[in-house]
Each structure stands twice: as structure tokens, then as C-alpha cells.
Amino acid sequence: MKLGKDTGSLVNFMLANPNFVKPEVGMDVTECHWTDRSAWRVVAVDDDLKGCTLQRYAPKAIGNYYEQRYQYEDEAGKPMLKEGHTMHIRYKYKRWKCGRSTVNLRFKCRCEYEDPSF
């Protein structure tokens, strides 16, 4: 991953981890975009442990827009996930991929962020 080519944010560049992490069901994952971040959860793991299916969180914003604080579980402690919003990823060629595209992921981290300047 190259700063300025794959990401415009130094924080996202530092967060993204292209190394292999053995995914586990229930593990949190953060996808690092150009400046934003999206929170996902592992819902299924492939038999060879080199791929998994992620489901997108549907976090609820807490406070005002610039605070960037989110609630990821409902009152009962159940994760708030978007129905039908999934992504299947595979680790190949030393990168996490979704189809032919490389995705910049941070495992064991749940972080939602929307850049307010856009």
C-alpha cells in the first residue's frame, strides 16, 4: 500500500495491515478507504482459513457530526449489522482481495469514520 496512491490519509495508511491474519467468526475488521473508514464483522470463514465473508456494521452516530463517535451494539448488546451488505475477501498475492481489487484492512479493530471535509 502506498501513501498518496492507495490512501490519502496517513492515519489510514498506518492502520491498514496487508499481512495475513487468521480470520475468526465475530472478529471486527476496519476497511481503510482514501480518507474514510468502514467497520465490518467476520460472519463466515472459508475452510482453508484464507478467506472470509464480512458483513457491514450499521453504526448509530452519537453526538454531533464532527465528534465521530458511534454505537455498534443495540441496547441488548447485539451487533447492529446491515442486512444483505456483505463482502467476501481472500488473501492472495500477499494482499487481501475482494474479487480483483485489493482492500486495505485492519483486523481486530472496529472503527467508523467519515471525513467531514467531503
Model segments located where?
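Short beta-strand-centered aromatic/proline hotspots
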Residues: 37-46
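Short intrinsically disordered terminal tails
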Residues: 1, 23, 117-118
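Short, extreme N-terminal segment that most often corresponds to the first beta-strand
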Residues: 2-7, 27-28
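Short alpha-helix capping/helix-loop boundary micro-motifs
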Residues: 8-19
